[in-house]
């Protein structure tokens, strides 16, 4: 029996090696690092020295029976992101001597969770930070939560008569809803509501810009974009508002250039076009006060600071500077008063504060043991494969001849394929086919052990790493917890939260709990590059191997679905104290199986009763004893109260 072990890449593995491997110092934005124990640490804010140990936190949450998978939300990071956004705009206003203010709003669609929105409103209250809503349900949330009468409530999305009536009447409550006209037929509904309610709303217009956008959401802008008015439609709307004596309520211009804009040049072009539209609206007699630059402010998921879909080639300060400078220049050239600037920056505010933690249930990988069969009566094609394996073993510790290794690898692949053909035709037994596959894996492992990283990545050998990769089974549903990974191939930073004093010599990807081949994570940030495999540790027997998926705060909870009936995970809100301790502020318990079934109109009581009737029948037929039936029913009733995820 021959054993082949994972190749050790370095004699001594350091924390700096882990930081470089996972690019933590680049995408972590100073919020995440690795401490002296080799665990991920979380910082209170980018200016603070206060940190907590994430691995220790998860272990202590487990002692409270708050088990993975779970979302940990760091309130301090959320607050710091809001502060950073405002600080950037305040610096830009001061630098460019802008004669008005920045007043942001948070788009509710990014994260509708009550605890999250309450924190955002609280943290942003000193700046009159408001909300942006895109439906009647979100409008009701905004009206209920926004108590600051100086905050803005930007009303976007499709609007029927009821939506417009609610927003119009809410102004009499002292609220500041601004109804943004995004479709031409909304003008008529607004005029009708004013006539019927004897109340006037604040009005805005969303413009369709002709500037070109980029990235995954590039089609959010342009003549064929989903929302907004073309220039001719804007002219007609202004005419109708004047005729209805509503032009004095026209206060805001809004535009949107897509989400996660990676290239600052795209933002500049859109700002120039929108600023000129704003100037022209003022010239047409609208008493404009606000320009809403929408969303699009991106974050650096991969830490490369480039214009790729998963990064940005600009900083928060760059963004604020360009917004302020561009709007100022257009207004001053036309003697127009500087407007209050609004942005709908969701992803940039909410992403960093949430970390999804899951445990690894097990792994699968190519066999690490090779059975050497008796050569007597051995099929020729298997003998050829075995001979190739021995040729590769002879090269161990010798000077590398890459062309010879490539030739031997091509031979191994050919002989393995010959074995598969022979098996299909009935010339090889199942045991012989298994041996052939083990030989091919052994050839791959010998090559991997003899080559360095650059050599193994040769185009003719690169598939070897994939062949030897392990699958790590993750205790989570990708479709529920990180649906963007599946739906749009969004890259999130994924890192073990402990064991960073050890070399992660395994290469692997993750498979989730669902019975779906799409339920895999196989795109990772590796030393600043996107790769299909991640450096991971071999899980230790009877010990948790815990993985963190970072920057998951935007959209994931809202978009997650119940594929295979895996429900919401535990959610914990954490405050980091000045003494490097923490306080658990909120715990939102995971969905039980009973709660999930109830969502689909299944009554737990009815299900239990149906199964009970079946057990009684089985008892009558002597298929089940009374004791077995009792144990079965007990387990079912307990299970209904428990998590949909796997437990220890």
From Swiss-Prot:
Enzyme class: lyase
Catalytic activity annotation: L-arginine + H(+) = agmatine + CO2
Cofactor annotation: Mg(2+); pyridoxal 5'-phosphate
Residue positions, PTM N6-(pyridoxal phosphate)lysine: 109
Residues reported in the UniProt entry to bind substrate: 291-301
Keywords noted in UniProt: Decarboxylase, Lyase, Magnesium, Metal-binding, Polyamine biosynthesis, Pyridoxal phosphate, Spermidine biosynthesis
Hydrolase in keyword set: no
EC number: 4.1.1.19
Pathway(s) annotated for this protein in UniProt: Amine and polyamine biosynthesis; agmatine biosynthesis; agmatine from L-arginine: step 1/1
One GO MF term attached to the UniProt entry: arginine decarboxylase activity
Matching PANTHER family: ARGININE DECARBOXYLASE, BIOSYNTHETIC ARGININE DECARBOXYLASE
Database matches in HAMAP family: SpeA
Protein family (similarity comment): Belongs to the Orn/Lys/Arg decarboxylase class-II family. SpeA subfamily.
Annotated function: Catalyzes the biosynthesis of agmatine from arginine.
Protein name per UniProt: Biosynthetic arginine decarboxylase
Species for this entry: Prochlorococcus marinus (strain MIT 9301)
Gene name per UniProt: speA
């Amino acid at each position: 029996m021959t054993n082949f072990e994972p190749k050790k890449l370095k004699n001594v593995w350091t924390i700096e090696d882990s930081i470089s491997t996972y690019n933590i110092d680049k995408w972590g934005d100073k919020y995440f690092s690795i401490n002296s124990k080799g665990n991920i640490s979380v910082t209170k804010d980018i200016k603070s020295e206060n940190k907590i140990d994430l691995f220790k936190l998860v272990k202590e949450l487990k002692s409270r029976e708050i088990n993975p998978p779970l979302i940990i939300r760091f309130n301090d990071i959320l607050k710091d992101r809001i502060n950073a956004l405002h600080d950037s705009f305040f610096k830009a206003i001061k630098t460019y001597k802008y004669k008005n203010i920045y007043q942001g709003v948070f788009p509710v669609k990014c994260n509708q969770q009550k605890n999250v929105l309450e924190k955002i409103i609280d943290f942003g209250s000193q700046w009159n930070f408001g909300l942006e809503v895109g439906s009647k349900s979100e409008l009701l949330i905004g009206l209920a939560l926004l108590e600051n009468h100086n905050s803005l409530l930007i009303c976007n999305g499709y609007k029927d008569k009821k939506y417009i009536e609610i927003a119009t009447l809410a102004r009499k409550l002292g609220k500041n809803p601004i109804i943004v006209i995004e479709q031409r037929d909304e003008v008529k509904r607004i005029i009708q509501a004013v006539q019927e309610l004897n109340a006037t709303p604040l009005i805005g217009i969303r413009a369709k810009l002709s500037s070109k956008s980029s990235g995954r959401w590039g089609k959010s802008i342009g003549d064929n974009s989903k929302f907004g008015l073309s220039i001719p439609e804007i002219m007609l709307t202004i005419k109708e508002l004047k005729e209805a004596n509503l032009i004095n309520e026209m206060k805001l211009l809004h535009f949107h250039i897509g989400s996660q804009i990676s290239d600052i040049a795209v933002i500049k072009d859109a700002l120039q076009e929108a600023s000129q539209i704003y100037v022209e609206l003022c010239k047409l007699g609208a008493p404009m006060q606000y320009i809403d630059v929408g969303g699009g402010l991106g974050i650096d998921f991969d830490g490369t600071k480039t214009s790729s879909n998963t990064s940005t080639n600009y900083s928060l300060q760059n963004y604020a500077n360009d917004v302020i400078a561009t709007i100022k220049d257009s207004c001053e050239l036309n003697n127009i008063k500087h407007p209050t600037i609004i942005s709908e920056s969701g992803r940039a505010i909410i992403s960093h504060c949430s970390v999804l933690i899951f445990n690894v249930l097990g792994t699968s990988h190519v066999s690490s043991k090779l059975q050497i069969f008796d050569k007597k009566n051995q099929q020729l094609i298997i003998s050829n494969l075995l001979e190739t394996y021995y040729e590769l073993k002879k090269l161990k510790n010798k000077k590398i001849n890459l062309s010879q290794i490539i030739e031997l690898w091509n031979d191994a692949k050919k002989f393995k394929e010959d074995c598969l053909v022979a098996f299909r035709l009935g010339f090889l037994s199942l045991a012989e086919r298994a041996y052939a596959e083990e030989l091919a894996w052994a050839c791959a492992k010998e090559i991997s052990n003899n080559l360095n990283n650059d050599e193994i990545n040769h185009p003719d050998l690169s598939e070897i790493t994939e062949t030897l990769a392990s699958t790590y089974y993750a205790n989570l549903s990708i479709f529920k917890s990180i649906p963007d990974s599946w739906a749009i191939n969004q890259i999130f930073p994924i890192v073990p939260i402990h064991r960073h004093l050890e070399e992660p010599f395994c290469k692997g990807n993750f498979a989730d709990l669902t019975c779906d081949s799409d339920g895999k994570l196989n795109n990772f940030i590796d030393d600043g590059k996107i790769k299909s495999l991640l450096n991971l540790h071999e899980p230790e027997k009877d010990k948790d191997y815990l993985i963190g998926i970072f920057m998951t705060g935007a959209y994931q909870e809202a978009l997650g679905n119940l594929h295979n009936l895996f429900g919401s995970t535990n959610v914990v809100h954490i405050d980091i104290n000045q003494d490097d301790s923490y306080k658990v502020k909120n715990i939102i318990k995971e969905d039980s199986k009973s709660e999930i079934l109830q969502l689909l109109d299944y009554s737990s009581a009815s299900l239990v009763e149906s199964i009970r009737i079946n057990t009684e029948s089985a008892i009558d037929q002597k298929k089940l004893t009374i004791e077995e039936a009792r144990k079965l029913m007990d387990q079912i009733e307990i299970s209904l109260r428990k998590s949909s995820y796997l437990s220890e």
